[in-house]
Amino acid sequence: MGPRARPALFFLILLRTVAAQGRPPRSHSLRYLFMGASERDHGLPLFEALGYVDDELFVAYNHESRRAESRAQWVLGEAHSQLWLQLSQSLKGWDHMFIVDFWTIMDNHNHSKESHTLQVILGCEVQEDNSTRGFWKYGYDGQDHLEFCPETLDWRAAESRALTTKLEWEVNKIRAKQNRAYLERDCPEQLQWLLELGRGVLDQQVPPLVKVTHHVASAVTTLRCQALNFYPQNITMRWLKDRKPMDVKDAESKDVLPSGDGTYQSWEALAVPPGEEQRYTCQVEHPGLDQPLTATWEPSLSNTLVTGVISGIAVCVIIFFIGILFRILRKRQASRGAMGDYVLGECE
């Protein structure tokens, strides 16, 4: 596998894990994204970490600085607190663990000369009823590789080439118990602390702006439902036909993406038969909405005017040609009548 740039790695992890695994309304999450490269010729350090609370970046760390740096205003005053120091120590420990794991995986693949990448996502989710779910996953060279199972203290291999590492790690029961303790105890406690710090910021809810647009290309009519400027990012979008839910395979969806201003955006497209656009409705659910929001495509006034003008011109043209045809027929009839009178006069 060739070198990968920093943005490609980041979005690989973010889109395949955070965006793909949307959270239920009123849940909260703490996620750490680790990434690194065996060679330094493509913009990635040996280890880099990003921490997110409810999709909000709050901390960054890399192998060169070995320092946790705040990335959100609501944690700036915590740089010298005991909990922040504990977080910094955890990141330093993960730095060392990541590098050891990286070399282990490369050795088990007999990879030593080429440039390779390792990605890790770990963290927890806390639901409204205080139930928790932990996750700890590894990706190697951009592909799912290993996943930790806290219930059984073992590892699940996502591909056959991960089996050697799986068996090697499962021998170390102490590490497995430490992983489970973090996911089930330390991570939820850390999340609660961060939620308290971010109160008023992390608990804000911005409802989406929803609109449906109409596109025609290559004789295919497509309706696109756009949800813009919403927060948090967990959102549900679906198409209804005659007010009834449709099969999701009929629609083309876009991952939830950041808008660049702290909010998110997404869209869902559907190909429809021409002339039946009004039978389709886009339904959107979001924590910022009291009830599901629906939207349909409404032809713009300009389109209506253009259609009306074209129709009017067509009618006028038809009437004009009918008038000309009528006058021609009348002239022909008049000419035939005059000719008949002339012939009769000759006979007399």
UniProtKB/Swiss-Prot annotation:
Subcellular location(s) per record: Cell membrane
Q: Which cysteines share a disulfide bond?
A: C124-C187, C225-C282
The entry annotates sugar attachment on N110, N130, N234
**A single GO molecular function, which one?**
transferrin receptor binding
Q: Where are the transmembrane segments?
A: 307-330
Domain annotation Ig-like C1-type: ranges: 207-296
Which domain of life does this protein belong to? Eukaryota
Stretch list, region Alpha-2: 115-205
Principal place where this protein is found?
A: membrane
- Cytoplasmic-side positions: 331-348
User: In the record, which residues are listed under signal peptide?
Assistant: 1-22
**What is the protein's name according to its record?**
Hereditary hemochromatosis protein homolog
